[in-house]
UniProtKB/Swiss-Prot annotation:
PROSITE patterns the record matches: ABC_TM1F, ABC_TRANSPORTER_1, ABC_TRANSPORTER_2, FAD_FR
Entry remark concerning the domains of this protein: In IrtA the ATP-binding domain (NBD) and the transmembrane domain (TMD) are fused. In addition, IrtA contains an N-terminal siderophore interaction domain (SID) that binds FAD.
Organism whose genome encodes this protein: Mycolicibacterium smegmatis (strain ATCC 700084 / mc(2)155)
Keyword 4Fe-4S attached: no
Name recorded for this polypeptide: Mycobactin import ATP-binding/permease protein IrtA
Function, as annotated: Part of the ABC transporter complex IrtAB involved in the import of iron-bound mycobactin (Fe-MBT) and carboxymycobactin (Fe-cMBT). Has a preference for Fe-MBT over Fe-cMBT. Mycobactins are then reduced by the siderophore interaction domain to facilitate iron release in the bacterial cell. Transmembrane domains (TMD) form a pore in the membrane and the ATP-binding domain (NBD) is responsible for energy generation.
Annotated CDD domains: siderophore_interacting
Source taxon at top rank: Bacteria
Keyword Transmembrane helix on entry: yes
Its membrane topology: Multi-pass membrane protein
ABC transmembrane type-1 domain span: 295-577
Cellular localisation: Cell inner membrane
Length: 860
């Protein structure tokens, strides 16, 4: 069958035919047909991810040997069985795809390719929301995206209605999704229907008819400010060209009054807002002060590159003069000029590098200062949501990546472009025929690179996800070595299995490219260019078609042509890495800071702590705490209990102002905590977390974090009260022993060290995340003694994980689903036979099971 130049090119890029056989057909709507197919080899190349699409070769309805290529997104896929489905819009008049689909029956076969398809995946740093725009043809891809978007991220779907049956197409479910149907009156209808609001940091998937796409791109870019990185446009079809045939006037889309879907009521519209900052443009904002400097450095590098090439040109002219018998004075003059230019080029290159290093040093100083200042104003919740590794990467590694971008990447990239272009121009002037030969290795390299890039397709994104996943798992595996070694191979074998899967993925991806990579390396070597120059230049010289001296510039400059071209990739790679680092840094600088509000008045006579109708959510419009009202009387212990995910830790974190509430207020001694500075707040509120943290420094410095000026006597008294003094004295240097990540203290000892820190801080209000949860029995007793001393005469809010530790609390608050469901003492709540009693009885069952004897009966 004839596929024309398009088919030849696709085969050249490594695409291969797979035969797909129709299994069944199903009419989703009167004008949308689902074809279920099976192919035993398709998923050797295809990726089973949302939005993955296939290239079908449909026969010509006229009966010729020509085949027509059409692309369809898979609406169903099963790599294990090789089964998949596509949804075909049945156009009238029918083109090749529509006509074939209408007549398709089980057993019919068709050729399929997978070249160029890329799947969709939710990024690790999710966008503010997803704006999905299309029509009936785009619904398989849109449904695929909806199916993997987390339920706490909003989705806005705009679908263009070309036929009254379009609204019958099933749309995937999502709790935060709104679907808008827009009747097509002309190509501007869909663009005009997009809500005027702040779309900052939304991901936009645009796949409508080609005419609509043109107007959509204009409005999304110009009015809403969508950057290219967040705008993913592609025309799925063109009106008037019904799958390759001319559409007549009779099949004009009928107008239908828009109506909301019966099975999918729309949620309230979000409030309009002004245009905000886009994360995709963050790098540009960070580097804006350096824009002029970087442009100047690029221009200077271009000049320096030409100056550095000039001596080689003069060397060729020197050889030409020498062979022609020129006078020694002329030769000396030319030689001195060449040496002078060589020295000048080296001096200018060194001066440019020195200048850029000075610029980078000042920029890095200001950047680190601004970054650390910003971090001091961020809520503590920002830090708890990130590991120390990511913060280290931000402050240290990313700023180092900017060093290469500022000082080296631009000059390297400019030199890599200017040098080969200048060399090529000069060689064409010398002899255009031999210069033309220099393109042969370059073209081979570019073709091979293009083929590899196209064949890699979705595997590039997969490799990035694999690398991120393996980096995280390797870190967790190394950190958990003590546990892994004690408890054996389960964790180790799991990590090794995942590592083997990763290696298998890389081998399967790269093995077919072995020959291509070897060829790419070969064609860019200086020896390859030298062989070409000699092989072509020698016959030209012997035949008199070329002056012998003219081959010298090719031997001096042409042999390095391939190496110079490779410098472009290295320079662009450095720019790409630096821009990603700049984006991460600027995104951090754009984070919302804690704002100190003006004090509007103090409510005298209030309890120590008051939660007044507090509502809070980690993402907008998704509250995890609902209208929490709670009072903590001075000198009492209040325990928060509830199942996992009920909001205990979140509620306690709000008192420490890890985050600001969305609604309501938290008052401390009658003052809204948002009117307190960090120093004022943490002089009154202390906390002991279950996940203890030690900082680099001595034992004494760790205890004295809250009061760096504390005397050694006060530090030791706090340690005695925390039952840790004797253990400290057994350390090599006592209180002067350095501690840190490699500390030899046990978990219980670290907990007692943090309790000593809280005792020394002596705050009237204490937040306690049940610190004995992971302590051994002996250490638990010492920790409990330390806690008894710590909680004396304080207002305590304790997050209880084991109910038997809080039976004597003055007040027990039961949370479920972010709401308070019960409040009272242990005895009253047990008598009430409510949720607390259920939790209590559930907590007793493991204890009986643990105490079971050999026969399985409980030991009394």
């Amino acid at each position: 069958m004839a596929r024309g130049i398009q088919g030849v090119m696709m085969r050249g890029f490594g695409a291969r035919d797979h035969q797909a056989t129709v299994v069944s057909t199903e009419a989703i709507t009167p004008n949308l047909l689902r074809l279920r197919m099976v192919s035993p080899t398709l998923f050797e190349d295809a990726v089973a991810e949302p939005t993955s699409w296939l290239r079908f070769w449909f026969p010509d309805p006229a009966g010729s040997k020509t085949e027509f290529q059409r692309a369809y997104t898979m609406s169903e896929m099963s790599p294990e069985t090789g089964e998949f489905a596509i949804d075909v819009v049945l156009h009238e008049p029918a083109g090749p795809a529509s006509r074939w689909a209408r007549s398709a029956k089980p057993g019919d076969a068709i050729a399929v390719m997978t070249l160029g398809s890329a799947g969709f995946s939710v990024p690790e740093d999710p966008p503010a929301g997803y704006l999905l725009i299309g029509d009936a043809a785009a619904t398989p891809a849109i449904n695929g995206i909806i199916g993997v978007v987390p339920h706490d991220i909003p989705i806005e779907v705009y679908l263009e209605e070309h036929d009254e049956n379009d609204r019958l197409i099933p749309i995937a479910e999502h709790p935060r999704m709104r679907v808008h149907w827009v009747v097509r009156e002309d190509a501007t209808s869909l663009a005009g229907a997009i809500e005027a609001r702040d779309w900052s940091n939304w991901y936009c998937w645009v796949t409508p008819e080609a005419g609509s796409l043109k107007h959509l791109r204009t409005r999304l870019r110009d009015e809403f400010g969508f950057p290219k990185a967040e705008l993913h446009p592609q025309a799925y079809w063109t009106e008037g060209r019904a799958m390759g045939t001319k559409r007549g006037d009779d099949d004009k889309t009928p107008e239908v009054n828009p109506a909301p879907r019966a099975d999918k009521p729309e949620a309230p519209a979000p409030a309009a807002a002004g245009r905000g900052n886009w994360r995709a443009q963050a790098a540009g904002r960070l580097l804006a002060p350096l824009k002029t400097t970087l442009i100047i450095s690029g221009v200077l590098q271009a000049i320096i590159t030409l100056v550095q090439l000039a001596p080689f040109v003069l060397l060729v002219e020197l050889a030409r003069l020498l062979l022609s018998g020129a006078s020694s004075d002329r030769l000396w003059t030319l030689g001195v000029v060449a040496i002078s230019l060589l020295g000048t080029g080296s001096f200018l290159a060194a001066a440019l590098t020195l200048w850029l290093h000075l610029v980078d040093a000042r920029f890095a100083r200001d950047l680190r200062t601004g970054l650390l200042t910003k971090m001091s104003r961020l809520p503590l919740g920002w830090f708890t949501a990130r590991g120390s590794g990511s913060i280290k990467q931000l402050v240290q590694d990313d700023t180092l990546s900017l060093h290469y971008l500022i000082t080296h990447a631009i000059p390297d990239a400019v030199a890599a472009v200017i040098a080969p272009v200048a060399v090529l121009v000069y060689l064409f002037v010398v002899d255009w025929r031999l210069a033309l030969v220099m393109f042969v290795p370059v073209l081979i390299y570019l073709v091979l690179m293009t083929v590899m890039t196209i064949q890699s397709g979705p595997k590039i994104a997969q490799s990035q996800r694999w690398a991120e996943r393996m980096s995280a798992e390797a870190g967790a595996y190394l950190e958990g070595q003590p546990v892994v070694r004690v408890f054996g191979g389960a964790a180790a074998s799991s990590f090794r299995r995942r590592l083997d899967e990763y290696i298998g993925f890389l081998v399967a991806w790269q093995k077919p490219f072995t020959g291509k990579k070897s060829m790419m390396d070969l064609v860019t070597r200086p020896g390859t260019f030298l062989w070409l120059i000699v092989a072509v230049g020698t016959p030209m010289i012997t035949s008199g078609a070329m002056d012998p001296v003219d081959i010298l510039p090719f031997l001096l400059l042409g042999t390095t042509f391939g190496v110079r071209l490779l410098g472009i990739a290295y320079g662009l790679g450095g720019i790409r890495g630096g821009m990603l680092a700049a984006r991460r840094i600027q995104t951090t600088l754009d984070e919302t800071e804690l704002v100190i509000r003006e004090q509007t008045g103090k409510r005298d006579g209030e309890p120590a702590v008051v939660f007044d109708n507090v509502t809070f959510g980690y993402r907008p419009d998704i509250p995890v705490l609902h209208d929490i009202s709670l009072q903590l009387t001075p000198g009492t212990v209040t325990a928060l209990v509830g199942p996992s995910g009920s909001g205990k830790s979140t509620l306690a974190a709000l008192l420490a102002r890890f985050h600001d509430v969305d609604a309501g207020a938290i008052r401390l001694g009658g003052r809204d905590i948002r009117t307190l500075t960090a120093d004022e707040l943490y002089r009154q509120v202390g906390f002991v977390l279950q996940d203890t943290q030690l900082v680099g420094g001595t034992v004494a410095e760790n205890i004295a974090l809250a009061d760096p000026d504390a005397s050694i006597e006060r530090i030791q008294d706090a340690a005695r009260d925390a039952q840790i003094h004797d253990r400290i004295m057994r350390l090599p240097n006592g209180y002067d022993t350095p501690l840190g990540a490699a500390s030899s203290l046990s978990g219980g000892e670290k907990q007692r060290l943090t309790i000593a820190r809280a005792i020394l801080a002596d705050t009237p209000v204490l937040i306690l995340d049940e610190a004995t949860a992971f302590a051994d029995p002996e250490s638990e007793y010492l920790v409990q003694q330390a806690l008894n001393r710590l909680t004396r005469d304080r207002t305590v809010l304790v997050i209880a994980h084991r109910l038997h530790t809080i039976t004597h609390a003055d007040q027990i608050v039961v949370l479920e689903g972010g709401r308070i469901v019960e409040t009272g003492t242990h005895e009253r709540l047990l008598d009430a036979a409510g949720r607390y009693r259920q939790l209590w009885e559930t907590g007793q069952r493991p204890a009986l099971a643990t105490a079971a004897g050999p026969t399985g009966e409980a030991v009394r």
